[in-house]
């Protein structure tokens, strides 16, 4: 029973209580770049979740056989291999989205969330817990990406997943899109607003002064 409870905590904790973007402020760069559309935000979230979960799993499986002096190299080799697999799958089955994501899938290799969970958690924890931790942190990352992508695409282009929701004035409708929301800096402000909302709702996440 305690194992099931711990698994649930590991899986759900990063979504709100210890969100990698909102609380740990990790993985922000990719969040700025890929959230102008919900479609790209969703695919990026799934890609990072898969890489984080399986890199955690594989690193945890061999953690007792990795010399401390080369552990970072081993971790990056495993992560890079998984990123290549994910990138090739996207190019094979979702080529247009792969083109839109451009270099950002490849940059998952250096994402602080992936590296951080591998070093801080997978190196010290059994495989199943590490795998669930990877999924949980991927979901936490994805929740923020989808929230930001929802606002940016809806109010920046009047659409969701490419389907027109708010009909533009230029097409005979009533809505004038806010083009500023499609620029990467807008995501920075939206993430800041999300962090403010979360920390207002959960004041224990506010850092102590001094």
Curated annotation (Swiss-Prot):
The EC number(s) this enzyme carries: 7.2.1.1
InterPro entries noted in UniProt: NqrD, NqrDE/RnfAE
Reaction equations catalysed: a ubiquinone + n Na(+)(in) + NADH + H(+) = a ubiquinol + n Na(+)(out) + NAD(+)
Keywords: Cell inner membrane, Cell membrane, Ion transport, Membrane, NAD, Sodium, Sodium transport, Translocase, Transmembrane, Transmembrane helix, Transport, Ubiquinone
One GO cellular component, as annotated: plasma membrane
Any one GO MF annotation of this record: oxidoreductase activity, acting on NAD(P)H, quinone or similar compound as acceptor
Transmembrane intervals: 14-34, 42-62, 72-92, 103-123, 131-151, 178-198
Membrane-topology annotation of the record: Multi-pass membrane protein
Compartments in which it is found: Cell inner membrane
Highest taxon above the source species: Bacteria
Chain coiled-coil ranges: none
A GO BP entry: sodium ion transport
Record HAMAP family: NqrD (MF_00428)
Annotated family: Belongs to the NqrDE/RnfAE family.
Quaternary structure and interacting proteins, as annotated: Composed of six subunits; NqrA, NqrB, NqrC, NqrD, NqrE and NqrF.
Record PANTHER family: ELECTRON TRANSPORT COMPLEX PROTEIN RNFE (PTHR30586), NA(+)-TRANSLOCATING NADH-QUINONE REDUCTASE SUBUNIT D (PTHR30586:SF1)
Job description of the protein: NQR complex catalyzes the reduction of ubiquinone-1 to ubiquinol by two successive reactions, coupled with the transport of Na(+) ions from the cytoplasm to the periplasm. NqrA to NqrE are probably involved in the second step, the conversion of ubisemiquinone to ubiquinol.
Record-given protein name: Na(+)-translocating NADH-quinone reductase subunit D
Lineage of the species this protein comes from: Bacteria, Pseudomonadati, Pseudomonadota, Gammaproteobacteria, Alteromonadales
């Amino acid at each position: 029973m305690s194992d099931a409870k711990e698994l649930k905590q590991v899986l759900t904790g990063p979504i709100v209580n210890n969100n990698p973007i909102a609380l740990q402020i990790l993985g922000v760069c990719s969040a700025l770049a890929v959230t102008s559309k919900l479609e790209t935000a969703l695919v990026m979230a799934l890609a990072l979740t898969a890489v984080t979960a399986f890199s955690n799993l594989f690193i945890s499986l061999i953690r007792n056989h990795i010399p401390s002096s080369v552990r970072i190299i081993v971790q990056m080799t495993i992560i890079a291999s998984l990123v290549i697999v994910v990138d090739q799958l996207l190019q094979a089955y979702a080529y247009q989205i792969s083109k839109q994501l451009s270099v950002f899938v490849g940059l998952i290799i250096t994402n602080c969330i992936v590296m951080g969970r591998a070093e801080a958690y997978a190196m010290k924890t059994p495989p199943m817990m590490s795998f669930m931790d990877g999924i949980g942190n991927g979901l936490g990352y994805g929740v923020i990406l989808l929230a930001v992508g929802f606002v940016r695409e809806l109010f920046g282009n009047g659409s969701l997943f490419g389907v027109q929701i708010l009909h533009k004035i230029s097409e005979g409708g009533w809505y004038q899109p806010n083009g500023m929301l499609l620029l990467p800096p807008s995501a920075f402000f939206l993430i800041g607003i999300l962090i403010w909302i979360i920390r207002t709702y959960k004041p224990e996440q506010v850092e102590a002064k001094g």
